[in-house]
Amino acid sequence: MRVKRAVHAKKKRKKYLKAAKGYRGALSRRYKLAKQMYVRSKWYSYVGRKQKKRDMRKLWITRINIAARNEGLKYSELIHGLKLAGVSINRKMLSELAVNDPEAFKEYVKIAKEALAS
């Protein structure tokens, strides 16, 4: 018996065209191009989720470095001093303290300086 694929094929094409709504020009109207762009967009979103983690860590380190230099320490010295002192605080929390609670951040800098001195 012959299998007619019209219903399934139309459903499949419709899925990609619906997902490609908002793309410019032929990318939202032609099935082949819409499918290619849909696959590419999924790849970009996958890569973007990985890059987001890198970018956030860079931002935290930059913020910590600026705040630490205002207190007379480099970022690397601060992290090393905190490790020597046995303080386990992650970069995200340090960054939050540097921005929102400078007094608490100064306490961590003081702890790091004491650990480096001894």
Swiss-Prot record:
Similarity comment: Belongs to the bacterial ribosomal protein bL20 family.
Question: Cross-referenced InterPro entries, in alphabetical order?
Answer: Ribosomal_bL20, RIBOSOMAL_L20_CS, Ribosomal_protein_bL20_C
**GO MF terms, alphabetically ordered:** rRNA binding; structural constituent of ribosome
Pfam families in the cross-refs: Ribosomal_L20 (PF00453)
Query: SUPFAM superfamilies annotated for this entry?
Result: Ribosomal protein L20
The protein's UniProt keywords, in alphabetical order, are:
Ribonucleoprotein, Ribosomal protein, RNA-binding, rRNA-binding
According to its UniProt entry, the function of this protein is described as:
Binds directly to 23S ribosomal RNA and is necessary for the in vitro assembly process of the 50S ribosomal subunit. It is not involved in the protein synthesizing functions of that subunit.
Q: Which HAMAP family match?
A: Ribosomal_bL20
- Could you give a single Gene Ontology term from the biological process aspect? ribosomal large subunit assembly
What protein name does the entry list?
Answer: Large ribosomal subunit protein bL20
PROSITE patterns attached to this UniProt entry: RIBOSOMAL_L20
Record's GO cellular component terms: ribonucleoprotein complex; ribosome
